[in-house]
Structure formats: structure tokens, C-alpha cells
């Protein structure tokens, strides 16, 4: 049997796996246990009351967190003409059409988000096998295929998170860093949950948000008492 590290022993001693923690208590505990030599991300897992096997119950979308994610995001935009100029002015690092597609095909992908104007999809469509497996393929459902590329760039830079349930009906995303304060992480989590509730499939029955858990990059997960969140959630 593998020997537990000091960090893992500390986590086991301090985290009650059956308890639902009040949000501020949970954040304080995660901060205490985040001992990695880098600033860890705070991640959330939301178990949804959906049947992920049914396409009409899948949940997918995007929302801008009020305090961002703490990450620096590099944006690539497929657009031409006025849209290309607007994307550059909004702060996109890479803007182009066939020239940008050539870079992607050559493996030059120094970006985190890809946005496209609708008229650019004839070019982007050729890149599906490259961008798709990396989760980078633009999609109108998450606002990355849009005629308003400037707004999409600003949203990406402002801390927009994209979400999609996995095969078990669980949403995984990031809501910030451990150096955010308790209020910032709480408000980011609440903003995400509000967005998820708005995206609830009409065919989903019973309890929709079944469980909410927070964890850090290298830490254990703690379950959140949803009653400790804002009444608007």
C-alpha cells in the first residue's frame, strides 16, 4: 500500500467527506490546505439532475464570472474586414483567416480560446479535427461563433467560463484562484449556478442542482451547503 504524503494526511485529517460545508468555511479550508508551490485554481463540480444520455437534457453554455478566473487568456479570432479590426481593438492576440488556419495546421496554437465570425466558419470548419479534441472549436451555443466578435473577445478576457456536462451529468469548471478572497469566490460560484439554472433543460425532472463541490488543483474536494449561498441561486 502506498505511503500517504504529509500533505495527503493533513487533508484526510481536516476534510470531513460526509459534511456539507458553509461556503466561507469551505473556502477557508481550501486555502489552508493549498500548499503547492504555485497559486492553485479553485475548481467546482456541479452534479446535475439530468439524464446525460438524452441530447435534450445536455447542458452547455458560457457565463462571465464577476471576478474573472485569475487566468491570463490568449484569444485567436477568425474574421475579416471590419470584424478583424474590431477583434484587434478588443485585445485579441491572433486575428486572421486562411493565414491563421495555416498556423493552426502547422501546430502553432498559442491561444486558449478561439472565436469566429459566421462568415469565417468555411475556414474554421476545416480545422475541426485539430480544434475539436482540444475543446477549442468555436460554437454558437457558447458564444464563440458570433457576428459581434469584439464582445466575445472582451468576455473571454474578462473571465468567461464555458461549461458542458460530462457523461455523468457533472459540470466541471474553474471559478478562480486560491488567492481570491472568500467573497470573490462565493460570488463567482453563485454567478455560475445562476447561469446553470437558466440553462436547465425543460425535460429535466426532480432536483436539478444535486451537489456542489469545490476543490483546488492539488487538494481534496469539499461539498458545499447550498443553503449558505445567495437566495438568488
From Swiss-Prot:
Pfam families according to UniProt: Ribosomal_L1
GO CC annotation: what is one?
cytosolic large ribosomal subunit
Gene name in the database record: rplA
What's this chain's function? Binds directly to 23S rRNA. The L1 stalk is quite mobile in the ribosome, and is involved in E site tRNA release.
Q: Which NCBIfam families match?
A: rplA_bact (TIGR01169)
What the entry lists under InterPro entries is as follows: Ribosom_uL1_bac-type (IPR005878), Ribosomal_uL1 (IPR002143), Ribosomal_uL1-like (IPR023674), Ribosomal_uL1/biogenesis (IPR028364), Ribosomal_uL1_3-a/b-sand (IPR016095), Ribosomal_uL1_CS (IPR023673)
What's the protein name? Large ribosomal subunit protein uL1
What family does the entry list? Belongs to the universal ribosomal protein uL1 family.
GO term, biological process aspect, one = translation
User: Subunit comment for this entry?
Assistant: Part of the 50S ribosomal subunit.
